[in-house]
């Protein structure tokens, strides 16, 4: 547990982890507000079973299970992210929301000397779980923060990653999250989004998996029926660097390059 203390994470007490408290942070390890952000109602109402409940991490923090949920595509999608980054992360990298599985440790292994990987999540229990997967000397910082209201300065990161977060958010929150991601990435930096996509009509999971998601993840249907472009901020200028589809179109990786804010009246490039 020593590495958890070094990141300012509350250690486990008995069988259950502490959900909503942090110890005072150690300097340069974790940026934590005196008052933690409140957990959004939609997260409590629809995702308590996957992220909020103390037992959630014990159930879902299993590599094979994460891979099963993504129909065997977890490693493939993680590999695509790392390959897009050239397995090299200089400067500051922001991962917006924790993820089950080994994605973050693999990202941490790619951080260049002098660089840093910073991860935000609104749930302390998820940050605690992530801390337990990272080496004590990993060049990381953890922040308890709302993805729709980041407290970072403008243009403070070289790149940001959204890995299967957008489909879990209502449209208004999704749009604010994307706007915040663009705000904190510097001009010339990139935003990479990995998530569901509208599947090919020949993909049988289009007809089978959507009803399952409707029951378990009520906002996911948006990404099955619309492109991410529908929620991108209209006041930001960016270009598409790369777009890949996987597994009969059901998953996507979209990489966008952030440009200078466009003058009023000038159309944004897409």
Question: Where in this protein do the model-derived segments appear?
Answer:
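N-terminal, positively charged/glycine-rich alpha-helical extensions of SAM-dependent methyltransferases
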Residues: 17-62
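C-terminal alpha-helical "lid/dimerization" subdomain adjacent to the S-adenosyl-L-methionine
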Residues: 48, 175, 192-253
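Conserved alpha-helix/loop element of class I SAM-dependent methyltransferases that forms part
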Residues: 69-90, 106
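Class I SAM-dependent methyltransferase SAM/SAH-binding core
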Residues: 92-149
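Short glycine-dipeptide loop
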Residues: 113-114, 185-190
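A short acidic, Gly/Pro-enriched loop at the edge of an enzyme's catalytic core
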Residues: 148-160
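A short SAM/SAH-binding and catalytic strip from SAM-dependent methyltransferases
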Residues: 158-172
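A short glycine-rich, Lys/Arg-flanked "PGG" loop and its adjoining helix->strand segment in the class I
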Residues: 175-187
């Amino acid at each position: 547990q020593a590495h958890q203390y070094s990141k300012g994470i509350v250690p486990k007490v008995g069988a259950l982890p502490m959900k909503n408290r942090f110890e005072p942070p150690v300097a340069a390890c974790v940026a934590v507000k005196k008052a933690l952000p409140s957990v959004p109602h939609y997260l409590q109402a629809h995702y308590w079973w996957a992220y909020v409940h103390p037992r959630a991490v014990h159930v879902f923090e299993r590599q094979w299970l994460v891979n099963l949920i993504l129909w065997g595509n977890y490693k493939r999608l993680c590999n695509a992210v790392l390959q897009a980054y050239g397995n090299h992360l200089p400067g500051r990298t922001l991962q917006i929301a924790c993820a089950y599985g080994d994605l973050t440790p693999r990202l941490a292994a790619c951080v260049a000397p002098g660089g840093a990987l910073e991860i935000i999540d609104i749930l302390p229990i998820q940050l605690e779980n992530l801390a337990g997967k990272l080496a004590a000397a990993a060049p990381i910082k953890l922040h308890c923060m709302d993805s729709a209201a980041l407290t970072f300065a403008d243009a403070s990161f070289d790149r940001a990653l959204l890995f299967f977060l957008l489909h879990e958010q209502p449209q208004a929150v999704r749009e604010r999250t994307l706007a915040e991601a663009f705000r904190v990435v510097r001009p010339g930096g990139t935003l990479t989004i990995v998530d569901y996509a509208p599947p090919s009509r020949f993909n049988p999971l289009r007809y089978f998996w959507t009803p399952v998601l409707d029951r378990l993840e009520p906002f996911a249907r948006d990404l099955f029926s619309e492109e991410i472009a529908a929620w991108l901020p209209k006041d930001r200028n960016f270009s598409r660097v790369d777009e890949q589809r996987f597994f009969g179109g059901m998953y996507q990786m979209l990489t966008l390059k952030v440009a200078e804010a466009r003058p009023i009246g000038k159309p944004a490039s897409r």
